[in-house]
Amino acid sequence: MNNPIQKWHDVVKLRDYNTLTEIIHDDAIFYSAVVYTPQKGKDITLKYLIAASEVFNSSSFKYDKEMIGENSASLEFSLTIDDTDINGIDLITWNNDGLITEFKVFIRPLQGVNLIHKMMQGMLESFKNVS
């Protein structure tokens, strides 16, 4: 089974959105920490992941722990935004071809969730204005 996690780390580190496009399945589902409904499809998943990459673009962002299975991984992260310490988990699932089929994000504490919600909303709105 192809494991896309190293490519994912490269995407995060280098903000390499071409590689991101290559590792997301056409029918991927993104589960946001701040949006109730699952976001279905490659295009919307890419928008959320790129927006998150821009919002989280901070020298303090890092993955602290990883648990990697046969076709899924749990990546614990931490960062600081506006003096708010935030941590969370990315749950990533992929298929036999190494394409990410599901991406779930969990964030804490509530102040961090609210801050990221506001920032993500602004970033996603800016994408709409560009399109």
Regions found by a protein language model. Give the residues of each.
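Conserved short hydrophobic patches within well-ordered secondary structure
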Residues: 21-24, 28-30, 116, 120-124
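A beta-strand edge to alpha-helix "cap/lid" segment located at domain peripheries
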Residues: 53-131
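Short acidic-aromatic low-complexity motifs
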Residues: 2-23
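A solvent-exposed, acidic/Ser-Thr-rich amphipathic alpha-helical stretch
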Residues: 18, 25-69
